[in-house]
A protein has these predicted regions:
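Eukaryotic scaffold repeat domains enriched in small/polar residues
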Residues: 2-325
């Protein structure tokens, strides 16, 4: 671990500063509105072996943050790495040396950067905003104190918050004013809303400025405008590499500059890439590269196209680069 250049100690107070691919446009296929078929007995061991020819990435290095527990991760435009663990936020330079550590006072299960490089944190039911130096700027409590924030995505004028407890995406302006609720169950259109059997519920903004939300219980990716309108979706329920299986996968995603999706799963633990329409492209990390019981693989992508995998089981940031052809 490199020398810590700065240490910023900031306590955020609780009250104050804290099968096939389906793709549609401007509508969602009726297949997306139906939960996967009833569960049957299966053996995921049959799917753990991956043809090496399908693995397009190799692990090039690891970073070991000094945390007991790891929660969330993000990269900024300069490839600095932001990791939350315990009740702190640690920042690493691209070489993997820790350059800052910020006391939060609460566990932050997710972290992201806005286009103007502000730091957004999800602290249980509170969104906290810091500047690049770790100074607390503002915070707000999500619409309900029962909220469990699992993901935050920030645009220039919009902040999207995934609330896994209430099964809704909350859209705010940067000051924390609620603009709308997105993706709720709608009996009139027969949309089932977000199916979230466990607290894994991720979202991200793509390079074209649209919001993507994982509907994990349906193994579906849903694409929304910033006005909250569903404009497209794709889904593939399957245990093979083409799709996603189990109760609720993928658990995490990141979006590459070309709009492709990097995904991680639990149960059948693996990291893959699907193209913008959902077609399987390649494996980043196969099941045999993870310890038994691994869950919570948060993902990030740096400017070089490297894929960062936060592995809570090993306590590592694992960095994967594309294999040379």
């Amino acid at each position: 671990m490199g020398k810590i250049l700065t240490y910023v100690g900031i306590a955020l107070a609780v009250a104050a500063v804290l099968a096939g691919i389906i793709f549609s446009s401007n509508r969602t296929s009726s297949a997306v509105n139906k939960p996967p078929e009833a569960a049957i007995l299966y053996n995921i061991d049959d799917y753990k072996k991956v043809d090496p020819a399908l693995i397009g990435y190799t692990e090039v290095r690891q970073i070991k943050p000094a945390f007991r527990e790891l929660y969330g991760m993000a990269c900024d435009a300069d490839d600095k790495i932001y990791v939350t663990g315990d009740e702190q936020l640690a920042i690493f330079d691209p070489a993997g040396d820790e350059i800052s550590r910020i006391d939060l006072g609460h566990e932050a299960k997710c972290v992201t950067l806005s286009p103007d490089q502000l730091i957004y944190l999800g602290l249980n039911h509170t969104v906290a905003v810091l500047d690049r130096n770790g100074k607390a700027l503002r915070s707000w409590v999500a619409e309900s104190e029962s909220a469990v924030i699992t993901s935050v995505a920030a645009g220039e004028r919009d902040v999207f918050v995934a609330d896994a407890m209430n099964k809704v995406v909350l859209q705010y302006d940067p000051a924390g004013n609620l603009l709308r609720r997105i993706g709720e169950k709608d009996p009139e259109s027969e949309r089932p809303g977000f199916i979230i059997p466990s607290f894994y519920f991720d979202l991200a903004i793509d390079p074209d400025g649209f919001l993507w939300v994982v509907n994990p219980g349906l193994h579906t990716f849903e694409n929304y405008t910033f006005e909250g309108k569903l404009r497209a979706s794709w889904r593939k329920t399957a245990f093979d590499l083409e799709g996603f299986g189990g109760c609720c996968n993928p658990t995490h995603m990141a979006i590459l500059p070309d709009g492709s999706f990097v995904t991680s799963e639990k149960g059948l633990v693996r990291v893959k890439i699907h193209d913008p329409t959902g077609q399987f492209r390649t494996v980043v990390a196969a099941p045999n590269q993870f310890a038994e019981g691994t869950v919570g693989l948060d993902l990030a992508v740096d400017s070089r196209g490297q894929i960062l995998v936060l592995d809570p089981k090993t306590g590592m940031i694992r960095i994967f680069a594309k294999r040379s052809s």
